[in-house]
Regions:
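C-terminal transmembrane helical hairpin of 12-TM major facilitator-type secondary transporters
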Residues: 13, 18-30, 34-99, 103, ...
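Multi-pass alpha-helical transporter architecture, strongest
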Residues: 142-170
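Helix-loop junctions at the membrane-solvent interface of multi-pass transporters
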Residues: 59-67, 84, 134, 151, ...
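Short amphipathic helix-loop junctions that connect adjacent transmembrane helices
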Residues: 1-16
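A late C-terminal transmembrane helix in Major Facilitator Superfamily
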Residues: 85, 99-137, 141-144
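Transmembrane helix-loop junctions in multipass membrane proteins, especially transporters and channels
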Residues: 69-73, 132, 136, 160-167
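Residue-level signal for discrete positions within transmembrane alpha-helices
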Residues: 27, 31, 116-117, 121, ...
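Small-residue-mediated transmembrane helix hinge/kink sites in multi-pass secondary transporters
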Residues: 3, 35-42, 94, 124-132, ...
């Protein structure tokens, strides 16, 4: 986020703290979002909340990050994205327990994390390839947001196999 801020806001002194402020704000709101996610999961269900987080994160990347070109909008994007889109690790064990039960939960959670590790390892590199190939952070936002939306859609089959009612707390 600091590199993006430096590119989008060349008027900021790169040796000052200013380009890092969006990262600091986003990390602060990530903590708030993870705590908040527990309350949301209690109210609406962990699987529904996990879907919402992924979906909101994808939409924020596609609609907001792709157009965040001012210092204020970059800070706002970072804050909103982490507040709403960063619930994965907080909700993963809770959602896994809802889907598979608590027996062997540590193993199940480990397999889920291992299953998403290729994306974690390759995601930043692929974003770099997109950035190098296009020279546009907007294209990176489209790529990243699209993958996050696709990830949110991958949650739906498991959710609806467990409970078909749309408004069910699951």
């Amino acid at each position: 986020m600091t590199a993006y801020t430096t590119v989008q806001c060349p008027e900021l002194d790169p040796d000052s703290l200013a380009p890092s402020i969006p990262l600091i704000v986003s990390n602060f709101t990530l903590g708030i979002g993870r705590v908040f996610s527990g309350f949301i999961a209690d109210a609406f269900g962990p699987i529904n909340s996990l879907f919402f987080s992924f979906f909101a994160g994808g939409i924020l990347q596609l609609a907001f990050w792709s157009n965040a070109t001012t210092y204020g909008s970059i800070i706002a994007f970072g804050a909103l994205y982490q507040l709403l889109g960063g619930w994965f690790f907080a909700l993963l064990p809770y959602a896994a327990a809802q889907l598979f039960g608590t027996r062997g939960l540590a193993t199940i959670t480990g397999y889920i994390i291992a299953g998403q590790s290729p994306g974690q390892f390759a995601g930043a590199s692929l974003s770099g390839v997109v950035l190098d190939g296009t020279g546009s952070y907007q294209k990176v936002a489209y790529y990243s947001g699209s993958l996050m939306l696709a990830g949110s859609l991958c949650i739906l089959p498991a959710r609806f196999l467990r409970e078909k009612r749309i408004l069910a707390r699951l």
